[in-house]
Amino acid sequence: MQFGVIDIGSNTVVLIIYELENGFPKVIFHTSSHVHLVSYIENHVMKEEGIEKTCNVLKEYKKILEEYQIKEYKAFITEPHRNIDNRKEMLQAFSNCGIEVIALSGKEEAELDYLGSQIDTKFISTGTAFDIGGGSTEFISFENNKIIEAISIPVGCVRLSKQEVSPLITDQYVEDTLDTYPKLLETKTNTIIGIGGTARASLKLYQNVYHTHESYMDVSKLEYIYNKLVEKDTDMISHMKESIEAGRQEVYLPGLNMLMSIVKGFKANKIQISTGCVREGFLFTYFN
């Protein structure tokens, strides 16, 4: 049976059509639109322009679902709905476009992130995972494949792109998070799991630079890439443009900056990248 999942995030709006084969999700169709929804929030209000832009994408996605004759589909929204005063109006506008949207809390997003990552990182039974999104970053600590702590902070690559790229800023975000949620450090290991778009984009760039097909990254080698991008090294910028889709390039370095602060805070020397994320976790949870 085939299922459709629409993910309305801070940076992109994604549609994936899955087919479950022996409980494993196989992607039949995938498309994404770089709406940068979080950038339309001003004074805790989502601008009409952002809502309208998202509605137009949802209408297109509904047509695709109809073309594929998908009867079972659901949509969810992550960080963009959490700190706005016109949340109800925005969700109603999406409903008026023909798509009912489930609003996930930060904790729910983090938990579904971890569940989705289990499709290919279950061999790491104890440790920490993170997902740097457009408007938020999720942290999950787990022991024996069970969640100990799952939290979300309203800091992501789109929001960071509005500031100077500075490790001092992101180091402080991570330090404050670990002070507030000390359980995140109770399952610390040398290898940390990277989930979501920033982590996957980093792996693509890493693979391009180092000519590897591995699904993990050595932190010291990734740091070299980061430093070259900060220096505006033309060769490294060319590697980035070859590896990372155009819609993400503008917010990539701010996201990588956050990533480097995370591995520093957790004293990790290796990052295992998962192909699964909140979407697969949502699929497993909301489609029985």
Residue map of PLM features:
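N-terminal basic/disordered segments at the start of proteins
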Residues: 1-27
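Short glycine-aspartate micro-motif
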Residues: 3-7, 127-131, 192
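Ser/Thr-glycine-rich phosphate-binding loops at phosphate-binding pockets of nucleotides
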Residues: 10-12, 133-139, 197
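Helical "lid/coupling" subdomains associated with nucleotide-phosphate turnover
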Residues: 17, 40-63, 80-91, 95-119, ...
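Conserved ATP-binding subdomain of kinase catalytic cores across diverse folds
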Residues: 24-39, 56-59, 66
